[in-house]
């Protein structure tokens, strides 16, 4: 695979880093926020959050017309700061969490060949926004 320019998506989240970290990594919470809209869901999540640990998210349309597994291995996990992983396809990604308030969550990933870079960016942005909304709704 040819190396492509990385895609970066970020958002500021108005919550303490401890809350953000927990909700980003707990399987029961991931199932709630890991979607692009109400037509999507993540019914299966396995998350062994440690360097060398593996993850599996089964994502798809809620009507069952489409699903896929998002799987890989954690390369680096630094609590409250960084998650770096390699997907089973060989693509890499990092997620950083700034210190302070609000927290800036930044996800940078190597795009796949399909769909388009714009579609992949929009998909990631929708999931990040879903996470932000989920976290901030928990604090109300």
Model feature map: region roles:
Residues 8, 66-71, 90-94:
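Short, surface-exposed coil-to-beta transition loops
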Residues 16-18, 49-50, 75-80, 96-104:
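A short, structured loop/turn motif at beta-sheet edges
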Residues 20-23, 30, 55-57, 74, ...:
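Hydrophobic pocket/interface hotspot
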Residues 41-84:
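Glycine-rich portal/gate segments that line the openings of hydrophobic small-molecule binding cavities
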Residues 82-126, 130-131:
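Beta-strand/loop substructures that line and gate deep hydrophobic ligand-binding cavities in soluble
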Residues 134-140:
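Short, highly charged C-terminal tails/helix-capping segments
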